[in-house]
UniProtKB/Swiss-Prot annotation:
This is Maturase K. It comes from Poa pratensis. GO terms for molecular function: RNA binding. GO terms for biological process: mRNA processing; RNA splicing; tRNA processing. Keywords: Chloroplast, mRNA processing, Plastid, RNA-binding, tRNA processing. It is found in: Plastid, Chloroplast. The keyword tRNA processing applies. Disulfide bonds: none annotated.
């Protein structure tokens, strides 16, 4: 109780009150524009008519914001293409998009202040390479060997938009800013219904990427706050009345009242929460919850998560979104790999004096393989091959130079091998490599109006082989990447690199 109250007071002391006036500062929108230019995923403030960002537009926007009828006009006429001032010719969508980018910058300020290091706290050294996606796999390899069950969770989404605003009220107590946020959400969807229309959420996500990511991360932060706190501190999870705790406001007061009714529950911590063999990993809207225990124990956690979303976030999620499987008998899709923990036979020769005998035992092994069907599907969607994996030419690239064609094919091939270097079976990668090499040859042959055989005889297959196996020297945290993948190599050696920070490099070049 004291720990939670202390956390709540510390959490409350960092709430921000006066955020709205920053929206009237021109430099805020300049920050938003510079962020879009320097971001790894460039987000340019562009309207549907390709009207780009300028300080003059921002000044006119701020003038309109000071006018009392600006918000009324947008709310009363959300479907009109133009505002009342037809001479200016600005679209209402463009104004809303600029505002959303500036609003996202402003509301991120309180959360950025929380990340500032405290002078009294010991500074934790930061290693850039620890951001690597591959750094999680050695952790899974060490821990999952001792676990029994795994729950693959599809985090419910989308949710009711009003809940997103209510979640921000715990961090930002600025009424005008929250009203402005409601205006954005009301502009892109029907306010009186659940946002089940994927068309409206797609438009909002596409035109307001920064704001959308901020709202979604706030929702995940609040959800994981309860998940982590209750797992560590509470002992009343199995009770049916635990739904009374799932309200953020006056949380400690309700726990204190419940502790009077059931004083014995708060004097001890049961193994249900404090079992050290429980691990939670979240990635790309999904999560993995692995633990050691019985099937009944893991089913409790499954229904706890369902009730958490139902009572606190006020929406119902289907139980089928949480798949509970036994690790030894199933595999799971994780970060582009099909992972499993099978029990492999192991023969051990034991020598005792003059007698020797063999001991046949079964040891669990963390196995990672490449999902060949999914990757061939990506290649087929990008028109490198057919659905069955037969290589074809890419006509859209025939207008490029020979070097550009080779560079694009080579980059995709190296990305595939670099990201999936942790696979325990490399033969699948060699098949994908063959598809890309032959597709590249057919594209070049089509450009020069020749056959593949004639083209390969003229250039030679050694040139393509050398091109696709060439890799840049990448320095990682532990070692230097020097291994080159070729057809004559180890088929079982797994290598995890510490320079991979995004999974999008695997799929997006194919689109």
């Amino acid at each position: 109780m004291e720990k939670f109250e202390g956390y709540s007071e510390k959490h409350k002391s960092r709430q921000q009150y006066f955020v709205y006036p920053l929206l009237f500062q021109e430099y805020i929108y300049a920050f938003a524009h510079d962020y879009g230019l320097n971001d790894s995923e460039p987000v340019e403030i562009v309207s549907r008519n390709n009207k780009k960002f300028s300080s003059l537009l921002v000044k006119r926007l701020i003038i309109r914001m000071y006018q009392q009828n600006f918000g009324i006009n947008l709310v009363n006429h959300p479907n009109q293409d133009r505002l009342l001032d037809y001479k200016i010719g600005f679209y209402s969508e463009f104004y809303s998009q600029i505002l959303s980018e500036g609003f996202a910058i402003v509301v991120e300020i309180p959360f950025s202040l929380r990340e500032l290091p405290c002078p009294k706290e010991k500074e934790i050294p930061k290693f850039q390479n620890l951001r690597s996606i591959h750094s999680i796999f050695p952790f899974l390899e060490d821990t999952f060997l001792h676990l029994d069950y795994l729950s693959h969770i599809e985090i419910p989404y989308p949710i009711h938009l009003e809940i997103l605003v209510q979640l921000l009220q715990y961090r930002i107590q600025d009424v005008p800013s929250l009203h402005l946020l409601r205006f954005f959400l009301n502009y892109y969807s029907n306010w009186n219904s659940f946002i089940t229309s994927m068309k409206s959420i797609f438009i909002f996500k596409k035109e307001n990427k920064r704001l959308f990511r901020f709202l979604y991360n706030s929702y995940l932060s609040e959800y994981e706050f309860f998940l982590l706190f209750l797992r560590k501190q509470s002992s009343c999870l199995p009770l049916a009345s635990s739904g009374t705790f799932l309200e953020r406001i006056h949380f400690s007061r309700k726990m204190e009242h419940f502790g009077i009714m059931y004083p014995g529950f708060f004097r001890k911590t049961i193994w249900f929460f404090m079992d050290p063999l429980m691990h939670y990993v979240r990635y790309q809207g999904k999560a993995i919850f692995a633990s050691k225990g019985t099937l009944f124990f893991n089913k409790k956690w499954k229904w706890y998560l369902i009730h958490l979303w139902q009572y606190f976030f006020s929406f119902w999620t289907q139980p089928r979104r949480i798949h509970l499987n036994q690790l030894a008998n199933s595999c799971f899709d994780f970060m582009g790999y099909l992972s499993s923990v099978p029990k492999s036979p192991l023969l051990v020769r034991n020598q005792m004096l003059e007698n020797s005998f063999l001991i046949d035992t079964r040891m669990p092994k963390f196995d990672t393989i490449v999902p060949v069907t999914a990757l061939i599907g990506y290649l087929s969607k990008a028109q490198f091959c057919t659905g069955s994996g037969h290589p074809i030419s890419k006509p859209i690239w025939t207008d490029l130079s020979d070097w550009d064609i080779l560079d694009r094919f080579g980059r995709i091939c190296r990305n595939l091998f670099h990201y999936h270097s942790g696979s325990s079976k490399k033969r699948t990668l060699y098949r994908l490599k063959y598809i890309l090499r032959l597709s590249c040859a057919r594209t070049l042959a089509r450009k020069h109006k020749s056959t593949v055989r004639t083209f390969m005889q003229r250039l030679g297959s050694a040139f393509l082989e050398e091109f696709f196996t060439e890799e840049e020297l990448v320095f990682s945290l532990m070692f230097t990447k020097t291994t080159l993948f070729s057809f004559c190599g180890s088929h079982s050696e797994r290598i995890w690199y510490f320079d991979i920070i995004r999974i999008n490099d695997l799929v997006k070049p194919l689109n």
